[in-house]
Amino acid sequence: MKKIFIGLSAIFAFAFGFTGCDTDYVTYSGPDYIMFSDTLTVLPVQNNEEYFDIPVAATEACSYDRTLGVEILDKKTNAVEGRHFSLESNTVTIKAGERTANVRIRGIYDNIEVTDSLGMVLQLVSKEESKWELYGTETKVILEKVCPFDIHLFEGYALIVTSTYFGSYMKDVSQRLIRTKVDPNAENTIIMKDYFYKGYDLKVKFTTNDLLNPLIEMEDQPFASTMEAFDTIYGDWEVWAYQSGYYLSYYSSCERFIFQY
């Protein structure tokens, strides 16, 4: 059975910098700093063997390879290496003539629950003179389990577990059991039959282009007659549903629910 309820969420952060590398071939003799390109990365862990790149950047290219160690800071980490994730290597090398390299990490899908809040802090082990105090040498990595999308997971019986409309206009209703079916004429769309009132269906579309932001889209559509909802004739005789422009509506394939504003 599916569940339909309400909510939202979102967070992001970045950091970067520039200066020079001291070699015989570079006229600028400023310090050579090395750091992670981002201070925060969220990884969508799927049921595959995919490795993700965590970029490392230097402020200048040098004429020699630079190899750094990669440490996991246990006191800032609750994900367990070997159980929740694995590193391809505990070192990272910036090749001669280059400014970037990648620490490669893989999440272990079967050992991560959708409700887990797992993350780790990685630290580059480098010479003291290579550390830029402004940005430091750490980065935080968050593991987020992403289940494969299958629209048929949302087909069948569904329970509307809460709605502000219930409290305002359907006083004796706290939950509502409805049926849903896949719309044969629209991609990734389901029809929620008799959503609030018999004869009035609602359609919602599932977006699948961003694994970390599985959003719901809904076009404006009528969901009741004014006579049935308000016991009066008003306007075009219909009450319309509009998707909020202020809050995100989203779904979870892992938990089989949609959260609609």
Predicted regions and their residues:
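Hydrophobic helical h-region of N-terminal Sec-dependent signal peptides
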Residues: 9-14
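C-terminal motif of bacterial Sec signal peptides marking the signal peptidase cleavage site
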Residues: 17-20
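Ser/Thr/Gly/Pro-rich, low-complexity flexible regions
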Residues: 146-261
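Acidic/polar, low-complexity intrinsically disordered N-terminal segments immediately downstream
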Residues: 22-102, 106-161
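Positively charged n-region of N-terminal signal peptides that target proteins for export
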Residues: 1-4
